Amino acid sequence: MSVFTNSYIPVNKYTRPGLKLQGVKKCVLHYTANPGAGADNHRRYFSNAQVYASAHIFVDKAEAICIIPLNEVAYHANDIQQRDSAGNPYRGVAALKPNANFLSIGVEMCLEKDGSFHSDTVERTEDVFVELCNKFGLDPIDDIVRHYDITHKNCPAPWVSNSQKFVDFKNRVKAKMSGKSVSKASPTKPTTSSPSSSSAVSGSLKSKVDGLRFYSKPSWEDKDVVGTVNKGIGFPTVVEKVKVGSAYQYKVKNSKGTTYYITASDKYVDVTGSVKTSSSAPKTTSTSSSSSSIKSVGKIKIVGVSSAAIVMDKPDRNSSKNIGTVKLGSTISISGSVKGKNNSNGYWEVIYKGKRGYISGQFGSTI
C-alpha cells in the first residue's frame, strides 16, 4: 500500500504542464515556508494558482498527497538564485543539469503554525522517500538532495541551517529501506531568521476564503491580478500595509521573495505579528504588453527540425496561425509550457518579439 494518496490537480500551464519527465535521477526535498498550511491546503492552492511553481508530493503530520503524477514535470527546482562569472545559473547537482524539473521528483514538507516540522511529518516524509527510492532504484544517501543543493535556495531552511538534520534524515531512510527499525523522528525547531526578511517585516498572512485575488502592484484592477489563494494559504512575509485608493492592501512576499499585494481586510485575511502602515502606496508606472511584462522562466534551444521551428499564435498545431520561426540551434526565452491540443508532446510558451507564442514541445530542449 502506498504511503501517499493520489489527488491530481488539473493540467494547466502554471502548475501542472502535462510534460513527461525525461527520467528520475534524484528526489528533491523542499519545505513549504507556509506555517500552518497542510498538504490539502497546498493541493487546493496549486489547483488554480497562476504562478509557475509546484511539487509532486506534499506531506504533513496527518497525510501525504501526490498532486502531480510521478511521470510528469513539476516546477520545483529550476529557479535562479546565483550566477557564475559567465552569467550562468548556479547548478550544484551535476546529474540534474540543465533543468532539474525534468529529471527529479519534488517533495514538500509542511510546517506547523510555529514554523517547525512535526515529528510525524518528518517520519511520514521518510516513508515517502523509502517508497520513491524503491520505485526508481535510487540510493537515499546519494540521490536525496535538498533544493538548496541544486540552486542554493534556502530550502528547506531548517535543514540548510542545520545540515546534520538532513544527513540524519537520509540515514533513517536508508535504514528503513534495509528493514531496520528506527526510533521516532524528533521534531525540527522553527528557524529564527529568513534571508528574505528585513527590519520592516514582522508578520505573515493567510486567506480566510477560497479564490482570494492578489496583485502585481498596489491596485484593485482586474488587469493587475496575477493569481489567487485559497483558504488556509497565504504568504510567509508581510512587509507593510499600504493605502490603495480608499482601502488598504498588504505588501507581501512569497517564499521566493517575489512581491505582491493583497487586500488587508480582516474579513478576508488573517495576519500574525505586527505590521507597519505606510501612508500611501508606492508610485507605479503603467506597462504595456511587451516582453518586460511577460516573465521568463528559462530558455530552450531549438532541436529536431530541418531548418527552423514554427512559432504559433496558440497551442494547437491544427488550427493556429504561424507568427514566425526560430532557426535550428537558436535559443528563445520561455514563459512556461502548456498541454494544448493535437500534440502529445505539448507546447513551449515562448516570448517571441515581445508577445506570447507557442512552439511544439518536441522542438525545444531546455538549457
Curated annotation (Swiss-Prot):
All copies of domain N-acetylmuramoyl-L-alanine amidase, residue ranges: 24-158
InterPro entries reported for this sequence: Amidase/PGRP_sf, Amidase_domain, NAMLAA_amidase_2, SH3-like_bac-type
Enzyme class: hydrolase
Protein task: Autolysins are involved in some important biological processes such as cell separation, cell-wall turnover, competence for genetic transformation, formation of the flagella and sporulation. Involved in prophage SP-beta-mediated cell lysis.
Keywords (A to Z) from UniProt: Cell wall biogenesis/degradation, Competence, Hydrolase, Secreted, Sporulation
PROSITE patterns reported for this sequence: SH3B (PS51781)
Catalytic activity: Hydrolyzes the link between N-acetylmuramoyl residues and L-amino acid residues in certain cell-wall glycopeptides
GO cellular component: extracellular region
Domain of life: Bacteria
EC number: 3.5.1.28
Taxonomic lineage of the native organism: Bacteria, Bacillati, Bacillota, Bacilli, Bacillales
Name this polypeptide is given: N-acetylmuramoyl-L-alanine amidase BlyA
Chain segments carrying region Disordered: 178-204
Cell compartments where the protein resides: Secreted
Gene giving rise to this polypeptide: blyA
Protein family according to the UniProt entry: Belongs to the N-acetylmuramoyl-L-alanine amidase 2 family.
